[in-house]
Structures are given as C-alpha cells and as structure tokens.
Amino acid sequence: MKLYKGDCLEVMDRMIAEGVKVDAIITDPPYGTTACKWDSVIPFDAMWEQLNRIIKPNGAIVLFGSEPFSSALRMSNIKNYKYDWKWDKVIGSGFQVAKYKPMIRSEDVCIFGTGGKVNYYPIKIKRDKPIKGYAVNNSLSNPLANADKKVRTYTHKNPTNILEFKKVKGTVHPTQKPVALMEYLIKTYTNEGETVL
C-alpha cells in the first residue's frame, strides 16, 4: 500500500507523470452540503480530467455522494455515468432536523467508466433455499420453450443495488466509510493484485 497526502488533483497529476494507471478509483469527494471548511466541492471539469487520465480502460470510477451533490455529479459526466448503488447505513442520521424532514439512512454510490462496460465482478448472495430452472444464456427462461435444456439448481443470486453496511461510530474522520463496505466495492470492481486509488 502506498499513501499520498495532498490535494487530490495535484497528487493525481504527479502519479500520471510517473506513468501510474489504476484499475479502479473508489473515493468519497466532498459534497459541499455542510458549512465545514473541508467540505468544498472539487471543480468537476478538473476532477474528471484527472480521473479519466489515470483510470485504465473499463476501470470503474466509484464516487460516494448525497443529494443535491449526486445529481450534479452525474450531470457533470453523463456520458460516462453507468448506474448507482444505494448504501443503506442501517441507522438514520440528521436527528437535529428530523422535525422538518426525514432522517437520512442512505448515500449514493455513483459508478462511472470511460469505456462501454466497466469491469464488474458481482459478489453472489447465497439463497435461503435453492431454486431450479432452465437457463438460456445464463438467465432463467420459460421451461416449455427450453424443454431440451437441463434443469439447473441455483444456490446463489446476483446482488441488488442496495448495499447494507452499518454506519461506523467513533470514527477518525467525519465521513469515514465502513471497512467492510470498501472491501465489498474493491472486490466488486477489481481482481486481486490490481491497483485501486
């Protein structure tokens, strides 16, 4: 592991100058939704220029966000936007304003990529009870239309776009994400031995 400290745009510029290319970028940029000094949105044009230069073809660019920042983020690069996950924190936040609006229990995880499809290695979920069905091109299909096909037993299912990881308490950083969530995203978008920024 190599750690860098500094302005992210300057650090990426140095890395690019050194010839560094990464397989995935997983980051939590400032959303600009608080009055905190550090919560200043990175200029989108400058950010995308660096991210697009450092990511390998088909690499995933994974960016956390919440509204209204997430909408602005997507629209800043709609050409390369792919889809969202919703991180369910299990515990709501925003008790101070719960009298005026619902507590916030989720955050967006926006996926971008410079090519067609981004590299994706879904972590299958074990089914409570296996199901049987016919498969054509790896999808369940009408058994009557596929009578000559063998019945398969499906013990696992594909993930949904909801990521349930309990929010961390007693953190070092105010927007710190759970280690388990970060591990999940790393395993979903890279293979062992690949480089993540």
Model-derived segments and spans:
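Core catalytic lobe of class I
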Residues: 1-197
